[in-house]
């Protein structure tokens, strides 16, 4: 009988958005336990080796991490399988680069470079609000931060802006129609649009309708919605494509146009 946590992850069973080819080995790096779920995170090793190509092997990644060059959300991380996830800020002091993990329209984590100014904060979705011992109000975010004494106006599903240096809330956005949001799960993963309305289904899942910048409408569950801006002004810089998913025909035309202009 197996006791304790699993220590391995087969390459075939690894999340598809890591984009690992299945023939180069048997195993994939199993993310450590941490603030993001296994299937919704990107281990540091994959980010450094497979995305940025700063290392060729896992050993090289370990050497980079052990020199304490890599910071995630302002904290040095030396664990190569540390699970970085949505909205995390990865900073490499040595090269002066900062990245924010956000989804592209295909539902993968894009290598999205940001300025040093933007790397000072992150947005977090409020998962839970409760009153702890001695009546102290607490707030829990999507990346497992617990913040005491939050603003009483902040409710579940709102988004808060956190200063990474202090861990304090600097601002917040209400979950409301007319606000800009990103979809963080389901078939519409990575799409960005404005919330048009919310259908309440007591005892089931609330459905939120979203309209993107091209006028396409789609719906998803409330749990997959992450508010990223007031009105249609995003509080973070957006990756290429601005979260608008193209149809297959549009993608083909775009590719052909790019080919002709370069050829």
Curated annotation (Swiss-Prot):
Lineage, top ranks: Eukaryota, Metazoa, Chordata, Craniata, Vertebrata
Alphabetical list of InterPro entries matching this protein: KOW, Rib_uL2_dom2, Ribosomal_eS4, Ribosomal_eS4_C, Ribosomal_eS4_central_region, Ribosomal_eS4_central_sf, Ribosomal_eS4_KOW, Ribosomal_eS4_N
Keywords: Ribonucleoprotein, Ribosomal protein, RNA-binding, rRNA-binding
Domain of life where this protein originates: Eukaryota
Keyword Signal: no
Organism per entry: Gallus gallus
Protein name: Small ribosomal subunit protein eS4
A cellular component annotation (GO) from this entry: cytosolic small ribosomal subunit
S4 RNA-binding domain ranges (all copies): 42-104
Matching Gene3D superfamilies: 2.30.30.30, 2.40.50.740, RNA-binding S4 domain
Family: Belongs to the eukaryotic ribosomal protein eS4 family.
Molecular-function GO term, any one: rRNA binding
Gene this protein is translated from: RPS4
Gene Ontology biological-process entries: translation
CDD domains in the cross-refs: KOW_RPS4, S4
């Amino acid at each position: 009988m197996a006791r304790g946590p699993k220590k391995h992850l087969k390459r075939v069973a690894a999340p598809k958005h890591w984009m690992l080819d299945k023939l180069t080995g048997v195993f994939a790096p199993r993310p450590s336990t941490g603030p993001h779920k296994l299937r919704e995170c990107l281990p540091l090793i994959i980010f450094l080796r497979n995305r940025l190509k700063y290392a060729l092997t896992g050993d090289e990644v370990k050497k980079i991490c052990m020199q304490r060059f890599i910071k995630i959300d302002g904290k040095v991380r030396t664990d190569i399988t540390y699970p970085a996830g949505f909205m995390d800020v990865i900073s490499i002091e040595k090269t002066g680069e900062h990245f924010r993990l956000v989804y592209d329209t295909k539902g993968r984590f894009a290598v999205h470079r940001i300025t040093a100014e933007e790397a000072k904060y992150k947005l977090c979705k409020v998962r839970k609000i409760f009153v702890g011992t001695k009546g102290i109000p607490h707030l829990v975010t999507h990346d497992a931060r617990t913040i005491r004494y939050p603003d009483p106006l902040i409710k579940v599903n709102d988004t808060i802006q956190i200063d990474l240096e202090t861990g304090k809330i600097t601002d917040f956005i209400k979950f409301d129609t007319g606000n800009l949001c990103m979809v963080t799960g389901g078939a519409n993963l990575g799409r960005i649009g404005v919330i048009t309305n919310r259908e309440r289904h007591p005892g089931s899942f609330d459905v939120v309708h979203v309209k993107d910048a091209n006028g396409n409408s789609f719906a998803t569950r409330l749990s997959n919605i992450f508010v990223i801006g007031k009105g249609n002004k995003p509080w973070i810089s957006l990756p290429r494509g601005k979260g608008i998913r193209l149809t297959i025909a549009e993608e083909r035309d775009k590719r052909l146009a790019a080919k002709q202009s370069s050829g």
